[in-house]
Design a protein with these regions (language model features):
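Ligand-site clamp/hinge motif
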Residues: 213, 241-287, 408, 417-419, ...
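N-terminal lobe/hinge region of extracytoplasmic solute-binding protein
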Residues: 55-106, 137, 217-221
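Long beta-strand-rich cores associated with HINT superfamily self-processing modules
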Residues: 521-547
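Ligand/substrate-recognition segments at binding pockets and active sites
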Residues: 54, 378-447, 491, 516-519
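Periplasmic-binding protein-like
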Residues: 192-194, 288, 313-355, 402-403, ...
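Extracytoplasmic/peripheral linker and loop segments enriched in polar/acidic and small residues
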Residues: 45, 325, 337, 417-428, ...
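Structural transition elements
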Residues: 345-379, 397-402
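Gly/Pro-rich hinge or "lid" segments in bacterial periplasmic/extracellular proteins
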Residues: 88-89, 166-173, 177-178, 184-249, ...
Length: 547
């Protein structure tokens, strides 16, 4: 049999993280204290003014919070967008933003937010509770086609609003201009973390209606920077927002150039035309020994997992768990880590270290073992190999293709032939959402710093297909454990439930886990107080430059 994967075009969001996966994997050994490397002593404290130039892999196309789904957008957008909460610069803490304070009812279902007086949009208008109601209902509105509508699906009245039987979401209530109330159908442990997502940022209705389909290219929001000049496929500039509720940023502006090639970024860094870049493996030795740059290396173990998604609706891989287990045993992940110079860790499941529920003593146990792989091939009914060739679709990132060639050679040893199919991001995502694929390389960076950001979209049957469960995995016990964990406030009990999910995952393997990235970047000596984030975001509101 063959697997002739047809992929059509798609959006331009995820392909960018491929660059991240390869350019940002980690070096032989991180310094004892991860996060940003120690800064050289500055002659003075933070100073106002200046411009920092960063990069993303390609033009983000849109900063509409309801539509954001890709890496390039996610790097830049947190500087433009803000909602009730925000992430700290290192991505590990949730900070109050436009919600100055909040209360949760005893039953955990009703959340009341007291908005910060005087917080403004970039157009100068003060933000009110009505703006949040509008923004959240816009995400839920089927006409918006937001890929993150599931984040608010637990709000009372969300389903009625989405199916057209109600003209508003009854569980989102404006108490007064400065007070917002949200009622959930049941308690949701990660709700606060979800509200820090850029997808749930507040936007002004009048600007959305003014710009229509072009709002994403002319976004008006409430973050520390506002959208400035945007040169298609070249660069975008964000300008400091003087009326930001927390005081204007130190910088006058941040510019992001669109540079896909990792070596070009290094050339531009050396020429003084970039202030930061990922450190490719080939350049690690140079930067780690340079007396200036070695003090400007930043590290972060990311909340990022790469894996091979299996379409469970298609034979033979989707209908045969033993065949999927054989695939995992056959993959030489240590060779992958070596090729990345140690800038990644072997993934023992979907969940990366550092998130609630990760248990290194209870993780997936599929070490590279050809004998085990061949035994499982025989049990699966394919002792002589699987007839035919099967496509693996993936974004068209050069270094990623090189990694897939290692997997291709591994699988050939046990009689599985795959063809590597680089696919533009639009068609790639279209294939995942429609189920028009057999195997696909994928990654996930959690939308919020909670295990629910992995398990609910990828494994709950409510999210089959476009909702994020691209494997089309459905297991009633897993659904129940995920749902119970979402509604449980006790962290120990949540961790136990997720470990039960992991145990079932290890048996079923709807996704074949590969690696977790370790992010390594370098900045020029003038950049101060920059911290890389495990969430793959670049936050600049506390960055300053020393000239």
């Amino acid at each position: 049999m063959k697997s002739t994967q047809r992929v059509t075009e798609l959006v331009l969001c995820l392909a960018l993280l491929g660059s991240l996966l390869i350019a940002c994997v980690a070096a032989p050994a991180a310094p004892a204290d991860t996060g940003a490397a120690a800064e050289p002593a500055a002659s003075e404290g933070p100073r106002m003014g200046g411009v920092v130039t960063g990069f993303v892999s390609s033009d983000p196309k849109s900063f509409d919070p309801a539509a954001i789904a890709g890496w390039d957008q996610g790097v830049i957008a947190p500087n433009l967008l803000e909602g009730l909460f925000r992430l700290s610069p290192d991505g590990r803490e949730i900070e109050p933003a436009i919600a100055e304070s909040f209360e949760v009812s005893e039953d955990g279902k009703t959340w009341t937010f007291n908005l910060r007086a005087g917080a403004k949009f970039h157009n100068g208008r003060e933000i009110t509770a009505d703006d949040f109601k509008y923004s959240f209902e816009r995400v839920l509105n089927p006409e918006t086609r937001s890929p993150k509508a599931w984040m608010l699906s637990i709000v009372v009245g969300a389903q009625a609003f989405q199916d057209g039987s109600a003209n508003e979401v009854s569980g989102i209530r404006v108490v007064d201009a400065g007070t917002l109330e949200i009622e959930l159908a049941e308690p949701l442990a990660p709700f606060k973390a979800m509200l820090a997502s850029i997808n749930l940022a507040v936007v002004p209705q009048e600007e959305v209606e003014k710009w229509g389909e072009d709002f994403g290219q002319n976004v008006v929001a409430a973050g520390p920077f506002s959208l400035g000049e945007w040169n298609l496929n070249q660069d975008v500039t964000l300008n400091s927002f003087d009326d930001y509720w927390n005081g204007r940023p130190y910088l006058d502006a941040v510019s992001f150039r669109f540079i896909g090639d990792e070596n070009t970024r290094i050339v531009e860094l050396d020429a003084g035309r970039l202030d930061m870049a990922w450190v490719p493996p080939a350049h690690w030795e140079r930067f780690s020994t340079d007396p200036v740059y070695k003090e400007k290396l930043g590290w972060a173990e990311t909340f990022h997992t790469d894996f091979i998604a299996v379409n469970l609706d298609r034979e033979p891989f989707g209908t045969n768990a033993k065949l999927r287990q054989a695939v995992r045993y056959a993959l030489d992940l240590d060779a992958i880590i070596a090729s990345l110079q140690g800038r990644a860790n072997v993934a023992q499941g979907l969940l990366p270290p550092g998130l609630l529920g990760y248990d290194e003593d209870a993780v997936l146990n599929y070490p590279t073992n050809l004998e085990s792989a061949q035994a499982l091939m025989a049990e699966a009914g394919f002792a002589d190999g699987v007839p035919g060739t099967f496509d693996v679709i993936l974004p068209p990132w050069g270094n990623l293709i090189k990694l897939l060639e290692i997997y291709q050679a591994n699988l050939k040893e046990i009689g599985i032939n795959i063809e590597i199919k680089p696919t533009e991001f639009g068609p790639y995502m279209e294939a995942l959402e429609s189920g028009n694929y057999d195997l696909a390389w994928m990654y996930r960076v959690t939308d919020y710093a909670d295990p629910d950001g992995f398990y609910f979209p990828l494994m709950h049957s409510d999210n089959l297909g476009a909702g994020g469960n691209y494997a089309r995995y459905a297991n009633a016990d897993v659904d129940e454990n995920i749902a119970t964990a979402r509604a449980t406030i006790d962290d120990a009990e949540r961790a136990r439930l997720y470990q039960e999910v992991d145990a079932q995952f290890a048996e079923d393997l709807p996704y074949i886990p590969l690696t977790h990235n370790i992010y390594v970047d370098v900045s020029t000596p003038r950049v101060q107080n920059y911290v890389p984030s495990p969430m793959d975001t670049h936050m600049f509101h506390r960055v300053w430059v020393e000239e």
